């Protein structure tokens, strides 16, 4: 008799499926999230793995790159940044006219290219203007021999200039370099205008007190056309006392308009070359009248009886 051998296989031990699936999921998750974490780290540091220079997704480069400076000290600004600077400096200049940084910012942000191009054409059409653009002189205490100016006769431009500097306690070195005008030559033209400002005070005798500054600004605007000067003449008097506005509107504005419109272009004056010239002769040649002494008018106002000098400065 044959023994019957069971065909049933022997029982095998089945592994727990969870013991395989769970570690696999953990490993897969670790791989995925580890990669995501590394990617996030690179995104945070600005270093993604797109190294193809032709790739449009290469974010190693900044999202927006600033233009390269066109000259030493130049700070390129886009249109929105210039608009913000103009708005902020306008408010700052009105509230704090003594703060030079607001005046500087307002001047450069409103020095529109068409205005400077017009001045450029004006200079290029004049022999002296062309010489200034070619040589690009700077008005500083180093370029001007201040001790020599003190030795000049009292009736000369150089003597009037140094006397005005000493009387007002200012220096030619107080004019900061232009930074926010993009074109190099236009930046120099504005720098030249800025550095010549004290000569306009000197030939007119106007002091640096607020009324004198406003009067010179109106003269500059009517002759040179710098927008900031016009804005100063328009809005600065609003902060003055009634008597100060009366002096400006009644005496110095008519003088500034007449002299500015009748005078030859002040931007074409090579001041460094005419320091020994008679100042009265210069005024006649240019067509500039000397205004009344502002400080003397203020002194007379203060000597008036109290009811008559009400609101005087």
Swiss-Prot record:
Pathway note: Cofactor biosynthesis; ubiquinone biosynthesis
Cofactor names: Zn(2+)
Membrane topology, as annotated: Peripheral membrane protein
GO biological process: ubiquinone biosynthetic process
Region of interest: Disordered: 290-313
Binding site for Zn(2+): 197-198, 201, 213
One Pfam family this sequence matches: Coq4
Domain of life: Eukaryota
Known catalytic reactions: a 4-hydroxy-3-methoxy-5-(all-trans-polyprenyl)benzoate + H(+) = a 2-methoxy-6-(all-trans-polyprenyl)phenol + CO2
E.C. numbers: 4.1.1.130
Main location: mitochondrion
Compartments reported by the entry: Mitochondrion inner membrane
Ranges of biased composition (kind: Basic and acidic residues): 303-313
UniProt KW keywords: Lyase, Membrane, Metal-binding, Mitochondrion, Mitochondrion inner membrane, Ubiquinone biosynthesis, Zinc
InterPro entries (alphabetical): Coq4 (IPR007715), Coq4_euk (IPR027540)
One Gene Ontology cellular component annotation held by this UniProt entry: extrinsic component of mitochondrial inner membrane
Top-rank EC class of the record's enzyme: lyase
UniProt similarity note: Belongs to the COQ4 family.
Assembly notes: Component of a multi-subunit COQ enzyme complex, composed of at least COQ3, COQ4, COQ5, COQ6, COQ7 and COQ9.
Further details from the record: This protein may be expected to contain an N-terminal transit peptide but none has been predicted.
Job of this protein: Lyase that catalyzes the C1-decarboxylation of 4-hydroxy-3-methoxy-5-(all-trans-polyprenyl)benzoic acid into 2-methoxy-6-(all-trans-polyprenyl)phenol during ubiquinone biosynthesis.
Protein name (Swiss-Prot/TrEMBL): Ubiquinone biosynthesis protein COQ4, mitochondrial
Gene: COQ4
